[in-house]
Amino acid sequence: MLKLAVGIFISPTLTRFSTGFNLAGSVLDQVLDYVPWIGNGHRYGNNHRGVDDITAPKTGAGSSSGTSTNTSGSRSFLPTFSNVGVGLKANVQGTLGGSQTTTTGKDIPKWPTLDPANLQLWTGAGWRNDKASNKQSDENHTTFKSATGSGQQGGSTTGGSAGNPDSLKQDKISKSGQNLTTQDGAPQSNSTTESASNYDHLPPNLTPTSDWPNALSFTNKNNAQRAQLFLRGLLGSIPVLVNRSGSDDSNKFQATDQKWSYTDLKSDQTKLNLPAYGEVNGLLNPALVETYFGTTRAGGSGSNTTSSPGIGFKIPEQNNDSKAVLITPGLAWTPQDVGNLVVSGTSLSFQLGGWLVTFTDFVKPRAGYLGLQLTGLDASDATQRALIWAKRPWAAFRGSWVNRLGRVESVWDLKGVWQDQAQAAAQAATTAAATGDALPEHPNALAYQISSTDKDSYKASTQSSGQTNSQNTSPYLHLIKPKKVENTTQLDQGLKTCWTPTRFAPSCAKALVQTIPPKPNPNPSKQPHRCLGRIVVTLAVCLVVGVLEEQTAPIRWTSPPLNGWVGGLWGNYPVGVGGIVVRILKVCKTLLFISIFISIFFLNCSLTLFIWTTASLATGLTVVGHFTSTTTTLKRQQFSYTRPDEVALRHTNAINPRLTPWTYRNTSFSSLPLTGENPGAWALVRDNTAKGITAGSGSQQTTYDPTRTEAALTTATTFVLRRYDLAGRCTTSTFRS
């Protein structure tokens, strides 16, 4: 019997994600509660160091629109903008065809990614510097001006774009005891004084003031947006800014030089690395765009080389090289770690290791926010290109299914999206217009895979007709099915084997027997007599309870009566669902008697089983008693036909005209559902002419109390029971009081 039960209720097909946490509901809340918030040495919360609202300057840090409205003079708990997003820090590594090795060679046509074994979530605040007078922070004292390269724009001759790691000025950090002194490492070109370590204001596009409530409540369990913000942090955590520690290709990007704080470096602050500039509640930092997506604004075109690494998924254009480059979204998910990205409506799901993470209302975020739609943030800059996912990324989704291993798989088709992009670009060009077929057809695939390509993999060739064609073999132009990982396969097979009913059922049975050993029977000869006695007691209790309930149960009306449970007679049972239920209950009652006999006789007649079966039988007989009483009451009524000029009677309590009070509402006859608007329902009405009641607007009520108005209820008072079948036909029956 146990084998049969296990075979019925346990499916041998398991989901891949049963190996990890179930992130649904409260479990996700628990996970978020323990996310290690790192930033400026403070937890992310009310103890975060903010600014004084009263004394904050109009362009002070933490506000782009002026001072806060708080007039209490207390310290504000608004986070600095870089504390809003979620980032991470790890050693920078290169990707070699899906396997990861530290990037130390001279010829490196790969793009830096992160070491998945050394990942830590952070709030992106590592480079956000408090005022130097605070002398409390020891994290990455790089000025905002240096970090963004803002001092090198506008005709600068340094040769580097804003945010280029080569162009960053290193902060000079001095530590005396527990006090830190930070200052810019190089003087400004037009001044002999060094730049201040703090910045005066934040760029407007980096200060999502309107999103501060969500940001502040990110760790609040009652915030409905916390899961959405968490996913934005995961997908929007841009890879760490590469610390280009050397002067040539032979010693750049060394993992040993990827340092993150003064604590790590102690004395050698020249190698201080900046954690990823991070995203601001989903917003990309333009300095990061310039650094990782090539010299987009400074040079007007993207380039991906070891000296100017580009990490992104740019829309391929036919007038430049090295365009199709995959975005590695902070978490360096290897093919076996992430896959099966599924989009349905506005929900997004993806596999992360053994987890299936699902979030809603994420596919179509606000313009400029990270998500499936990545666009340039600086709308005023004509050279700021859109980053793929294209305009409507959800249009590329073709569906998903569950394979034999229980994994969710999905199909994407970007051909149409890419052709639209190529067609638009071709029409804007001065050369012959391309048809859009020049781009290769992109095969359907299941997930994204971080891969590698040389910058020359994408080439453009001009045909004799002058039409430009794409000759591209770059794997970045395709969505690649994840590689099969042997360990994962073995894990799936092991779980499947473990949960096979033929193996699971005997194990459970054995464990059950070992857990509950049988009690010895000192006198087996008397055991049947003891069981028979208990059977008699059980049956007697059940019968007494059922009979008493049947005799005392009044007629039970619902408001409105439920789909044929009451009304009309069919033998001794109500018509419709009620009759079926009564018959089912009678069968169940018989089965209960049989089961209690078997249970008591063969299972040692435990006290727990005795109580359980007694309660079950009593409950079953109670329900049967209700229906029997209802049927008996209806049979006493005298049925006849009446005119169709009634008012609707809506009950607010149990109805029995002879025993209990009732209330009906005067309603216009025309409002009754005579045309099948409510098929299968019952309507109990009262004759409109018997008591001289005028059909009202539905706001009047008349209450009948049998203890006071019995005499007023004459034989002329007629109650009508109307039923509407599925075809809209009306069956009317009446009875007099």
Curated annotation (Swiss-Prot):
- Which residue spans adopt a coiled-coil conformation according to this UniProt entry? none
Biased composition, class Low complexity, residue ranges: 59-76, 461-474
Extract the ranges annotated as region (Disordered): 47-76, 93-116, 128-214, 457-476
Q: Which InterPro entries does this one have? A: Adhesin_P1_C (IPR004940)
Q: Name one Pfam family in it.
A: Adhesin_P1_C
Q: Where is the composition biased (Basic and acidic residues)?
A: 128-142
Regions of biased composition (Polar residues) lie at 175-198
Q: Where are the transmembrane segments?
A: none
Q: Where is there biased composition of kind Gly residues?
A: 151-162
**Protein family (similarity comment):** Belongs to the adhesin P1 family.
Can you say what this protein is called?
Putative adhesin P1-like protein MPN_370
